[in-house]
Amino acid sequence: MYHNFLINSTVPERTVRFLISKSKSIAVIVILLAVLVVLALLYRGNKAEEQFEQGTTMAMDTVFMVKVAGDKPDGYIELVNKLDAALDVYDEDSEIYKLNAKQNANASDVLLDAVKSSLQAEEKLSSVSITAGGLIKLWDVNGDNPTVPDEDDIQKELSFVGKDKITLSGNSITLMEGTKLNLGCCAKGYACDIIEKKLSENNVSCAIVTFGSSTLLYGKKPDGERFVTAVTNPFEPSETLLTVKTDECFISTSGGYERFFEQNGKTYSHIFDLETGCPADTDIMSVTVICDSGIMSDMLSTELYIGGTEMVKEYLASDEYMIIAIDKSKNIYASDKLSESITLKDKSFTLK
Protein backbone atom coordinates (compact mmCIF):
# COMPACT_ATOMS: atom_id res chain seq x y z
CA MET A 1 0.00 0.00 0.00
CA TYR A 2 1.26 3.47 -0.88
CA HIS A 3 1.28 6.32 1.60
CA ASN A 4 1.36 9.84 0.26
CA PHE A 5 3.67 12.29 2.02
CA LEU A 6 3.02 15.89 1.03
CA ILE A 7 6.19 17.91 0.83
CA ASN A 8 5.52 21.31 -0.67
CA SER A 9 2.90 24.03 -0.83
CA THR A 10 1.34 25.55 -3.92
CA VAL A 11 0.01 28.47 -1.93
CA PRO A 12 1.52 31.73 -3.20
CA GLU A 13 4.11 33.00 -0.74
CA ARG A 14 2.33 36.35 -0.63
CA THR A 15 -0.90 34.58 0.33
CA VAL A 16 0.85 32.58 3.02
CA ARG A 17 2.02 35.83 4.57
CA PHE A 18 -1.58 37.00 5.02
CA LEU A 19 -3.10 33.66 5.97
CA ILE A 20 -0.62 32.59 8.62
CA SER A 21 1.38 34.54 11.17
CA LYS A 22 4.56 33.09 12.58
CA SER A 23 2.86 32.65 15.94
CA LYS A 24 0.30 30.20 14.56
CA SER A 25 0.60 26.60 15.64
CA ILE A 26 2.56 24.11 13.59
CA ALA A 27 -0.63 22.08 13.28
CA VAL A 28 -2.27 24.84 11.24
CA ILE A 29 0.76 25.04 8.97
CA VAL A 30 0.74 21.29 8.41
CA ILE A 31 -2.95 21.39 7.44
CA LEU A 32 -2.21 24.13 4.90
CA LEU A 33 0.73 22.14 3.63
CA ALA A 34 -1.42 19.05 3.17
CA VAL A 35 -4.15 20.86 1.26
CA LEU A 36 -1.99 23.03 -0.99
CA VAL A 37 0.62 20.81 -2.59
CA VAL A 38 3.03 20.98 -5.53
CA LEU A 39 5.19 17.95 -4.82
CA ALA A 40 4.50 14.54 -3.31
CA LEU A 41 6.73 11.63 -2.40
CA LEU A 42 5.38 8.12 -2.22
CA TYR A 43 6.56 5.79 0.55
CA ARG A 44 5.79 2.08 0.56
CA GLY A 45 4.75 0.61 3.90
CA ASN A 46 4.37 1.88 7.45
CA LYS A 47 7.73 0.48 8.58
CA ALA A 48 9.71 2.79 6.27
CA GLU A 49 7.54 5.76 7.14
CA GLU A 50 8.10 5.34 10.87
CA GLN A 51 11.85 5.90 10.44
CA PHE A 52 11.27 9.58 9.68
CA GLU A 53 10.75 12.53 12.00
CA GLN A 54 9.19 15.72 10.67
CA GLY A 55 9.53 19.40 11.54
CA THR A 56 7.72 22.38 10.05
CA THR A 57 8.00 26.14 10.48
CA MET A 58 7.49 29.44 8.70
CA ALA A 59 10.52 31.18 7.21
CA MET A 60 10.94 33.83 4.49
CA ASP A 61 7.14 34.10 4.39
CA THR A 62 6.55 30.52 3.31
CA VAL A 63 6.42 26.99 4.68
CA PHE A 64 9.64 25.13 5.46
CA MET A 65 9.37 21.40 6.10
CA VAL A 66 12.03 18.80 6.82
CA LYS A 67 11.44 15.07 7.13
CA VAL A 68 14.57 13.23 8.20
CA ALA A 69 15.59 9.63 8.89
CA GLY A 70 18.07 8.93 11.66
CA ASP A 71 18.12 12.44 13.09
CA LYS A 72 15.94 15.01 14.84
CA PRO A 73 14.44 17.87 12.79
CA ASP A 74 15.13 20.52 15.44
CA GLY A 75 18.63 21.43 14.25
CA TYR A 76 17.42 22.00 10.70
CA ILE A 77 14.55 24.18 11.90
CA GLU A 78 17.06 26.21 13.92
CA LEU A 79 19.31 26.55 10.89
CA VAL A 80 16.56 27.77 8.57
CA ASN A 81 15.42 30.27 11.21
CA LYS A 82 18.98 31.62 11.25
CA LEU A 83 18.87 31.98 7.47
CA ASP A 84 15.47 33.66 7.73
CA ALA A 85 16.84 36.26 10.16
CA ALA A 86 19.51 37.20 7.62
CA LEU A 87 17.73 36.88 4.26
CA ASP A 88 14.02 37.74 4.66
CA VAL A 89 13.80 41.03 2.77
CA TYR A 90 10.27 41.70 4.06
CA ASP A 91 11.27 41.52 7.74
CA GLU A 92 12.34 44.92 9.07
CA ASP A 93 14.53 43.19 11.66
CA SER A 94 16.40 41.08 9.12
CA GLU A 95 19.99 41.72 8.20
CA ILE A 96 19.28 42.20 4.50
CA TYR A 97 16.50 44.72 5.22
CA LYS A 98 18.93 46.80 7.29
CA LEU A 99 21.60 46.54 4.59
CA ASN A 100 19.16 47.87 2.00
CA ALA A 101 18.30 50.78 4.29
CA LYS A 102 21.90 51.76 5.08
CA GLN A 103 23.51 50.70 1.75
CA ASN A 104 26.54 49.38 3.66
CA ALA A 105 27.09 46.82 6.41
CA ASN A 106 29.59 44.48 7.97
CA ALA A 107 27.73 41.33 7.08
CA SER A 108 27.39 38.13 9.05
CA ASP A 109 28.90 35.00 7.57
CA VAL A 110 25.37 33.89 6.68
CA LEU A 111 24.48 36.95 4.60
CA LEU A 112 27.94 37.23 3.07
CA ASP A 113 27.97 33.61 1.91
CA ALA A 114 24.45 33.90 0.50
CA VAL A 115 25.39 37.01 -1.49
CA LYS A 116 28.65 35.49 -2.76
CA SER A 117 26.90 32.26 -3.77
CA SER A 118 24.18 34.22 -5.58
CA LEU A 119 26.67 36.34 -7.51
CA GLN A 120 28.62 33.23 -8.52
CA ALA A 121 25.44 31.62 -9.83
CA GLU A 122 24.56 34.81 -11.72
CA GLU A 123 27.76 34.38 -13.75
CA LYS A 124 26.07 31.47 -15.55
CA LEU A 125 22.85 33.39 -16.18
CA SER A 126 21.69 36.48 -18.05
CA SER A 127 18.21 37.38 -16.79
CA VAL A 128 18.32 37.06 -13.00
CA SER A 129 19.89 39.42 -10.45
CA ILE A 130 19.76 39.80 -6.67
CA THR A 131 20.17 43.58 -7.16
CA ALA A 132 16.62 43.97 -8.51
CA GLY A 133 15.15 44.62 -5.06
CA GLY A 134 14.13 48.19 -5.86
CA LEU A 135 12.31 47.14 -9.02
CA ILE A 136 10.48 44.37 -7.15
CA LYS A 137 9.46 46.81 -4.43
CA LEU A 138 8.29 49.35 -7.02
CA TRP A 139 5.81 46.90 -8.56
CA ASP A 140 4.86 45.52 -5.12
CA VAL A 141 3.42 42.30 -6.57
CA ASN A 142 3.97 40.64 -3.19
CA GLY A 143 2.39 43.49 -1.25
CA ASP A 144 -1.03 44.91 -0.48
CA ASN A 145 -1.20 47.45 -3.32
CA PRO A 146 0.46 46.20 -6.50
CA THR A 147 0.19 48.54 -9.48
CA VAL A 148 1.80 49.23 -12.85
CA PRO A 149 4.42 51.95 -12.26
CA ASP A 150 5.29 54.86 -14.51
CA GLU A 151 7.88 54.03 -17.17
CA ASP A 152 10.27 56.66 -15.82
CA ASP A 153 10.20 55.01 -12.41
CA ILE A 154 10.83 51.60 -13.98
CA GLN A 155 13.85 52.88 -15.90
CA LYS A 156 15.21 54.54 -12.77
CA GLU A 157 15.07 51.28 -10.83
CA LEU A 158 16.67 49.39 -13.73
CA SER A 159 19.65 51.74 -13.49
CA PHE A 160 20.33 50.29 -10.02
CA VAL A 161 20.42 46.67 -11.24
CA GLY A 162 23.64 44.82 -11.98
CA LYS A 163 26.55 42.97 -10.40
CA ASP A 164 28.63 46.13 -10.68
CA LYS A 165 26.26 47.84 -8.22
CA ILE A 166 27.50 45.73 -5.30
CA THR A 167 30.98 45.71 -3.76
CA LEU A 168 32.36 43.05 -1.42
CA SER A 169 35.44 43.70 0.70
CA GLY A 170 36.18 41.30 3.51
CA ASN A 171 32.95 41.07 5.48
CA SER A 172 31.73 44.42 4.16
CA ILE A 173 28.91 44.70 1.62
CA THR A 174 28.41 48.08 -0.06
CA LEU A 175 25.54 48.86 -2.42
CA MET A 176 25.50 51.66 -4.94
CA GLU A 177 23.14 54.38 -3.76
CA GLY A 178 19.63 53.34 -4.76
CA THR A 179 20.43 49.63 -5.18
CA LYS A 180 18.50 47.15 -3.04
CA LEU A 181 19.03 43.43 -2.70
CA ASN A 182 16.29 40.83 -2.92
CA LEU A 183 17.29 37.17 -2.81
CA GLY A 184 13.82 35.90 -3.67
CA CYS A 185 15.19 34.36 -6.87
CA CYS A 186 17.59 32.13 -4.95
CA ALA A 187 17.21 32.21 -1.15
CA LYS A 188 15.15 29.04 -0.81
CA GLY A 189 17.35 27.07 -3.17
CA TYR A 190 20.39 28.39 -1.33
CA ALA A 191 18.83 27.32 1.97
CA CYS A 192 18.42 23.80 0.58
CA ASP A 193 22.15 23.79 -0.22
CA ILE A 194 22.97 24.75 3.36
CA ILE A 195 20.61 22.11 4.75
CA GLU A 196 22.24 19.48 2.53
CA LYS A 197 25.64 20.24 4.06
CA LYS A 198 24.26 19.74 7.56
CA LEU A 199 22.56 16.49 6.55
CA SER A 200 25.89 15.23 5.23
CA GLU A 201 27.75 16.29 8.38
CA ASN A 202 25.18 14.42 10.49
CA ASN A 203 25.46 11.25 8.37
CA VAL A 204 21.74 11.25 7.63
CA SER A 205 20.63 8.40 5.36
CA CYS A 206 17.54 10.03 3.85
CA ALA A 207 15.70 13.34 4.10
CA ILE A 208 13.14 15.42 2.28
CA VAL A 209 13.30 19.20 2.57
CA THR A 210 10.76 21.51 1.00
CA PHE A 211 10.92 25.28 1.13
CA GLY A 212 8.31 27.05 -0.94
CA SER A 213 9.03 26.17 -4.55
CA SER A 214 12.41 24.53 -3.81
CA THR A 215 12.95 20.97 -2.65
CA LEU A 216 15.88 18.78 -1.62
CA LEU A 217 15.61 15.00 -1.95
CA TYR A 218 18.56 13.62 0.01
CA GLY A 219 20.11 10.17 0.24
CA LYS A 220 18.26 6.94 -0.45
CA LYS A 221 14.75 5.94 0.57
CA PRO A 222 14.52 3.14 3.15
CA ASP A 223 12.61 0.93 0.71
CA GLY A 224 15.38 1.29 -1.88
CA GLU A 225 13.08 2.82 -4.49
CA ARG A 226 13.62 6.12 -6.29
CA PHE A 227 11.93 9.32 -5.16
CA VAL A 228 8.65 10.05 -6.94
CA THR A 229 7.78 13.73 -7.28
CA ALA A 230 4.44 15.10 -8.46
CA VAL A 231 4.53 18.24 -10.61
CA THR A 232 1.45 20.43 -10.36
CA ASN A 233 -0.79 21.43 -13.26
CA PRO A 234 -0.19 25.20 -13.64
CA PHE A 235 -3.67 25.63 -15.14
CA GLU A 236 -5.28 23.78 -12.20
CA PRO A 237 -2.83 24.11 -9.29
CA SER A 238 -4.77 21.68 -7.09
CA GLU A 239 -4.19 18.87 -9.60
CA THR A 240 -1.15 16.76 -10.49
CA LEU A 241 0.03 17.03 -14.08
CA LEU A 242 2.74 14.38 -14.00
CA THR A 243 5.08 12.45 -11.75
CA VAL A 244 8.82 12.05 -12.21
CA LYS A 245 11.20 9.53 -10.67
CA THR A 246 14.63 10.78 -9.56
CA ASP A 247 17.52 9.91 -7.32
CA GLU A 248 18.73 12.47 -4.76
CA CYS A 249 18.64 15.97 -6.22
CA PHE A 250 17.43 19.54 -5.87
CA ILE A 251 14.17 20.58 -7.55
CA SER A 252 12.83 24.12 -8.06
CA THR A 253 9.80 25.39 -9.95
CA SER A 254 9.03 28.88 -11.24
CA GLY A 255 5.67 29.93 -12.61
CA GLY A 256 3.72 33.10 -13.17
CA TYR A 257 0.53 31.47 -11.89
CA GLU A 258 1.88 31.48 -8.33
CA ARG A 259 1.81 35.21 -7.57
CA PHE A 260 0.31 37.91 -9.75
CA PHE A 261 -2.12 40.80 -9.94
CA GLU A 262 -4.47 42.07 -12.62
CA GLN A 263 -4.91 45.63 -13.83
CA ASN A 264 -7.05 46.84 -16.73
CA GLY A 265 -7.62 43.26 -17.84
CA LYS A 266 -3.93 42.32 -17.99
CA THR A 267 -2.15 39.90 -15.67
CA TYR A 268 1.24 40.77 -14.19
CA SER A 269 3.33 38.06 -12.52
CA HIS A 270 6.01 38.37 -9.84
CA ILE A 271 8.84 37.29 -12.18
CA PHE A 272 10.55 40.24 -13.86
CA ASP A 273 12.31 40.61 -17.19
CA LEU A 274 15.31 42.80 -16.43
CA GLU A 275 15.49 43.94 -20.05
CA THR A 276 12.15 45.73 -19.76
CA GLY A 277 11.74 46.11 -16.00
CA CYS A 278 8.28 44.57 -16.33
CA PRO A 279 6.87 41.16 -15.45
CA ALA A 280 8.08 38.60 -17.98
CA ASP A 281 6.04 38.29 -21.18
CA THR A 282 6.57 34.59 -21.80
CA ASP A 283 4.90 31.61 -23.46
CA ILE A 284 5.75 29.46 -20.44
CA MET A 285 3.38 28.60 -17.58
CA SER A 286 5.93 26.89 -15.36
CA VAL A 287 9.46 25.50 -15.40
CA THR A 288 10.90 22.84 -13.12
CA VAL A 289 14.67 22.38 -12.89
CA ILE A 290 16.29 19.27 -11.42
CA CYS A 291 20.02 19.32 -10.69
CA ASP A 292 22.74 18.92 -8.05
CA SER A 293 22.62 22.53 -6.79
CA GLY A 294 19.79 24.16 -4.89
CA ILE A 295 20.70 27.71 -5.80
CA MET A 296 21.11 26.87 -9.49
CA SER A 297 17.82 24.99 -9.64
CA ASP A 298 16.12 28.04 -8.12
CA MET A 299 17.75 30.69 -10.31
CA LEU A 300 17.74 28.69 -13.55
CA SER A 301 14.04 27.92 -13.26
CA THR A 302 13.45 31.68 -13.13
CA GLU A 303 15.81 32.30 -16.04
CA LEU A 304 14.07 29.70 -18.21
CA TYR A 305 10.62 31.02 -17.33
CA ILE A 306 11.68 34.45 -18.55
CA GLY A 307 13.44 33.07 -21.64
CA GLY A 308 10.45 31.01 -22.77
CA THR A 309 10.33 27.84 -24.83
CA GLU A 310 13.19 28.85 -27.13
CA MET A 311 15.59 29.04 -24.19
CA VAL A 312 14.11 25.89 -22.64
CA LYS A 313 14.89 23.92 -25.81
CA GLU A 314 18.56 24.88 -25.51
CA TYR A 315 18.74 23.07 -22.15
CA LEU A 316 16.85 19.87 -22.93
CA ALA A 317 20.03 17.98 -23.86
CA SER A 318 22.07 19.41 -20.97
CA ASP A 319 24.27 17.09 -18.91
CA GLU A 320 23.99 19.34 -15.83
CA TYR A 321 20.27 20.08 -15.66
CA MET A 322 17.00 18.23 -16.21
CA ILE A 323 14.06 20.39 -17.27
CA ILE A 324 10.29 20.06 -17.30
CA ALA A 325 8.52 23.07 -18.83
CA ILE A 326 4.84 23.61 -19.59
CA ASP A 327 3.80 26.22 -22.14
CA LYS A 328 0.51 28.07 -22.53
CA SER A 329 -0.63 25.66 -25.25
CA LYS A 330 -0.37 22.68 -22.87
CA ASN A 331 2.82 21.35 -24.39
CA ILE A 332 5.33 19.75 -22.04
CA TYR A 333 9.05 20.02 -22.82
CA ALA A 334 11.19 17.54 -20.91
CA SER A 335 14.88 16.70 -20.91
CA ASP A 336 15.96 13.65 -22.86
CA LYS A 337 17.22 12.00 -19.66
CA LEU A 338 13.72 12.10 -18.16
CA SER A 339 12.01 10.23 -21.00
CA GLU A 340 11.71 6.99 -19.00
CA SER A 341 11.03 8.70 -15.67
CA ILE A 342 7.90 10.76 -16.38
CA THR A 343 4.34 9.49 -16.02
CA LEU A 344 1.77 11.87 -17.51
CA LYS A 345 -1.46 12.05 -15.49
CA ASP A 346 -3.42 14.57 -17.59
CA LYS A 347 -3.79 13.41 -21.19
CA SER A 348 -4.98 16.83 -22.38
CA PHE A 349 -1.29 17.84 -22.37
CA THR A 350 1.20 16.85 -25.06
CA LEU A 351 4.60 15.54 -23.99
CA LYS A 352 7.10 16.75 -26.57
Set out the residue ranges of the language-model regions.
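Mature catalytic core of soluble alpha/beta enzymes
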Residues: 2-352
